[in-house]
Amino acid sequence: ILVGIVDSGVDYFHPDFRNEDGSTRILRLWDQSVAGNPPENYVSGTEYTKEEIDEALALGETEGRRLVPSGDFSGHGTAVLGIAAGNGRASEGVKRGVAYRSDLLVVKMGNPRENSFPRTTELMEGIDYLIRQAVKMRKPIVINVSFGNNYGSHEPYN
């Protein structure tokens, strides 16, 4: 089973997203905020593979983050993914997520606009990407999108 998130990114160095041998559980990470090598059928961002993330992990944090410069500056995506699928390595198995044995897919949404959020189209592309990856891998997927809004009237009679 795959667990996918569209969120603020992920700290891929976090132990809960690594296997016992230290390799990553993240099969793909699409960072929409980093220009460079977008996934097939998309025009923005950079896609990182499991192999690239494993190479970054082997280099250590300083050098590794140069190779795969994707992060989670707010921590929200990392927390969400941990609740959904963290394996508990950081807490010796005490604090693990719901689907702690699953493989992971991550979409980090693009940079927010001034006084705003990333575009809705980026969110939709992220969901589309996750579904396409699951189909390609022939695996079922659960997708978490932890975004909401407060649109519309807030008067008591509207």
Task: Name each model-derived stretch.
Residues I1-T121, M137-V142, Y151-H154:
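Subtilisin-like serine protease catalytic core
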Residues N144-S146:
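Active-site neighborhood of phospho(di)ester-bond hydrolases with catalytic His/Asp-centered motifs
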Residues L123, Y157-N158:
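Well-ordered, non-membrane alpha-helical segments in soluble/globular domains
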Residues D128-A134:
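An often Trp-containing, charged/polar helix-loop segment at the C-terminal end
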